[in-house]
Amino acid sequence: MRGGNCLASLNSKIKMISARNKMKGKVINVNKGAVNGIVKVKFGSNTVSATISLEAIKELGITEGKEVTAIAKATDVMVGVGEIKGISARNIFKGEVVKINEGAVNSIVNIKVEDTLFSATISKEAAEELKLAEGKEASVIIKATSVMIMA
């Protein structure tokens, strides 16, 4: 029975998540404020910033050097083309459009940034205005407050 209890405990810790965007990496900085902190995670040559509560930082044991996964829902990802400036979002990653799945109202745009594939759900109208196409350079844009951390 003891082995069964260990397996049950392990299974309760393994979770699946529907969010499409997962950036696995190492925490390189934790900047704590009064209520929230900004956690910076290095994945490939990029760094993603996540604003999370101090309570979450403590509960997850987030410290510099810890391996974590930063997560963002596809609906929280914006897409830009050309030079991105004058925007408050902290996370901007240049990549290449590798696939567009067009729907009647929304499009799912897949953008490859180094070895990480990002999915963004944007309006079909926006995809058309941006003239997105496979092979075109585009930027993934994510607010730090839209990034979750899994540890």
Feature map (PLM): residue ranges:
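Glycine/charge-rich catalytic "coupling/switch" loops of P-loop NTPases
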Residues: M1-K24, N29, T47-S49, L54-K99, ...
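Short strand-coil-strand connectors
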Residues: K42-G44, K112-E114
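Intrinsic disorder/low-complexity detector
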Residues: L7, N31-G33, K112
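Short aromatic-glycine-enriched beta-strand elements
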Residues: A34-K40, A104-N110
